[in-house]
Structures are given as structure tokens and as C-alpha cells.
Amino acid sequence: MIRKILQTETYRKWEKKLKDPRARKMITARLYHIANGLFGDTSPVGEGISELRIHYWPEYRIYFKQEGDIIIILLCGGDKSTQDKDIQKAKEIAKRVEVDEL
């Protein structure tokens, strides 16, 4: 089953700022795998939010929540150096975002 991946504006802005084309390709490939049900290296961070780890320097993190079996909402992204701040931001965004808004 292919999952639908939705992105918040915060996530889109973060991804657009990435200057490293290899990192962008790695993230795109990882999202393709997720859409096909292959989540790989993920870990729950609380309040229904999970962290997707991309093993590339710097170690990128993408925060998401899943609603049902078909929708994944990309809340925000960052790297290891901003991890704590990004987790808090993801939790705040998750509280106010609605699937039908994306």
C-alpha cells in the first residue's frame, strides 16, 4: 500500500534551504521508501511524533506523525545539532495542524 505523504509549510521551507544536492536526494529517496511502507531508522519522540534519521553528515532528522495507515505528515526537519529544539517545534506544529489543511 502506498502511503500519502503530506508536508507542512515549515518542512517545505527547511527542505528548500538544503544546499547539498546529495542530502536532498537521500531525503527524497527515504521519503519514497516510507511511502512504500519501509520506514527504516525511526524512533518515537513522544506525543505521537516520530523521528526519521538520515545517516549523512550532518545527521538529518525529519519529524512526522502518522494518522491511520495512509497519511504521514512531515512536520519539520533539522540535524543533530538542533534536535531538541526541532522535537519541541514538531510537537507544537502537530498540535495545531489538521490533515485537510495540507
Regions flagged by a language model, labelled:
Residues 29-56:
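A short, surface-exposed loop/turn module that caps and links secondary-structure elements
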